[in-house]
Design a protein with these regions (language model features):
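N-terminal secretory signal peptides that target proteins for export/translocation
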Residues: 1-5
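Bacterial N-terminal signal peptides
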Residues: 9-23
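Generic hydrophobic-segment detector
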Residues: 14, 44, 48, 96, ...
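Soluble extramembrane regions of membrane proteins in the secretory/endomembrane system
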Residues: 24-254
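Transmembrane alpha-helical segments that form the functional core of multipass membrane systems
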Residues: 247-289
């Protein structure tokens, strides 16, 4: 009797172990979920935190891909570098979809993506670096421009995109429409001459895909193979489920107060509050504000 109990217990343990192993293999399988991030506005530290969190979330549940829907005039170079590095280190395919505008910093973020896509009527470029400390000396400005140009060339080379056009967005502050960036429309003759191109059509193109909306983009991603963390990964979006990953309340607040206009208003209010505190000491509220 005791022997039967022992055998039954061992059998039960084996069944449980097999079930756990099967569950682990199922959970480790890539899902058909596509995470969507929305970046609208300046590229500031709060946006970097948001993108990092979004990519980490996609990695945790092995999403088919994470799409960053982007519309930005630009932002801080240091923050842009962090976002670019996070995309390069990602363990899931990262797709940047230029919804309206990928200006300056947005150009780097777009070109860092495993897949770069643009919406009709959108634009990309004008990525020349500008110092927040005022005018730089000619030497320092040249160093900054050359370093930034090398960075964007390396990104274009890594993803097999047009290095000449990418560099021109930094050195010459050129911008391209979605059709020009896709190599489907001729660039202006003056730009063609400036770039030293034989053809007015960018070849290879600056971006990979054109899509009217996110659903159209996801359909085009299905079956596309990209290099993710040194491995060839085929994106499978068949039967996909979209998962919107929004900014947290804190991230929204930090992004809002990082806006130069809002920051100026807040600074002005702080100065007024300090003046009132000096005029009416002990009023408490102005000093606290």
């Amino acid at each position: 009797m005791a022997l039967r109990v022992i055998r039954f217990s061992m059998l039960l343990l084996c069944v449980l172990a097999a079930a756990l192993a099967l569950a682990g293999s199922i959970s480790a399988s890539p899902s058909s979920e596509v995470d969507i991030l929305h970046v609208d506005g300046d590229i500031v530290p709060a946006v970097s935190s948001y993108i990092d969190r979004g990519i980490s979330h996609a990695e945790d549940h092995q999403a088919a891909a994470v799409i960053i829907e982007l519309s930005t005039p630009g932002g801080l170079l240091s923050t842009t570098e962090k976002i670019v590095d996070r995309i390069l280190d990602a363990k899931v395919p990262v797709v940047v979809y230029v919804d309206r505008w990928a200006g300056s910093a947005g150009t780097f973020i777009t070109l860092a993506a495993h897949v770069a896509a643009m919406a009709p009527g959108s634009r990309i470029g004008a990525a020349s670096p500008i110092s927040t400390q005022g005018d730089l000396s000619e030497t320092l400005q040249k160093k900054l421009t050359q370093d930034t140009a090398a960075r964007i060339r390396s990104l274009a080379d890594l993803r097999g995109r047009n290095e000449i056009a990418a560099e021109a967005t930094v050195v010459e502050a050129l911008s391209f429409t979605d059709q020009e960036a896709l190599g489907l429309a001729p660039i202006p003759a003056s730009d063609q001459q400036l770039l030293g191109l034989d053809s007015p059509y960018l070849s290879p193109p600056l971006v990979d895909l054109g899509a009217k909306d996110v659903d159209s983009l996801i359909a085009q991603l299905n079956g596309r193979t990209v290099n993710v963390a040194g491995e060839q990964v085929t994106i499978n979006t068949e039967g996909y489920v979209k998962n919107d990953v929004g900014m947290s309340t804190i991230e929204k607040f930090l992004q809002a107060i990082s806006n130069p206009d809002i920051a100026y208003v807040l600074l002005s209010l702080a100065v007024i509050a300090l003046i009132l505190e000096f005029i009416h000491p002990g009023a408490i509220l102005p000093g606290v504000v």
